[in-house]
Curated annotation (Swiss-Prot):
Displays ATPase and GTPase activities. GO terms for molecular function: ATP binding; GTP binding. This is Nucleotide-binding protein FRAAL4592. The keyword Isomerase does not apply.
Amino acid sequence: MTTPTLDLAIITGLSGAGRSTAAKCLEDLGWFVVDNLPPALLSTMAELGHRSGGAVSRIGVVVDVRGRAFFSDLRAAIAALDARGMHPRMLFLEASDDALIRRFDHVRRPHPLQGDERVVDGIGRERALLAELRGEADLVLDTTDLNVHELRSKIDAAFGQPGANRLNATVVSFGYKYGLPLDADLVADCRFLPNPHWVEELRPYTGRDPQVRSYVLAQPGAQEFLDQYAALLRLVGEGYAREGKRYLTLAVGCTGGKHRSVAMAEQLGARLAADGVGVRVVHRDLGRE
């Protein structure tokens, strides 16, 4: 039996350069992230990952090596992992002195190495201490001019998997008489279409049934609505992707959540899937009557 491959990433760098943000980005990509792990425990963490049988295949570790002893421990831990055939990738985050000073001023906290001196003194001390480690990093990111979304994009490019950045949409049909879904990002109202409930031969069926679906889609404005709303969702989806938002809940409503909203939700879900969006269609109120 083949042992599952373990991907190990070490996040380190200057205080205030974005280590915590980078860790959150890895978590959003599905990594198991441990903050401020002592370097001496890296091998133990890697072993636990191997023993998980693939349940934990990507581990990110935020390492603080401001102490000289921790610096030596980190180099020894990486050497031990290399000897076992595991080659962790190291991400080093840095920023300009001006940017770091502004960030510490914004959070109103002292630099951990400034002591009784100024923030800039602590930054200089840490920069000198970590200079050698920076030279050994696999990837150095300067976050001086990066906002959170731009940093996320760079982390995605370096550590994401194919398809990890795609938008995932949950399309929820619902009945207005039961209330709007609380988690909806966007709401589409299909009550402008004639209600199949008032067509006696269609009343027992739902929007999943072909006779109701055909009736709804044949109504004036139905296809135009689908075309224009799908175009809107493409635009919104692209914007969400740029902003690092990967999950969208689209609510599609009619009076009772049985006919029109169900048929239209199925159609919108199919169009989103054709555009490469991960889609799950849920009919919240189907069967409530």
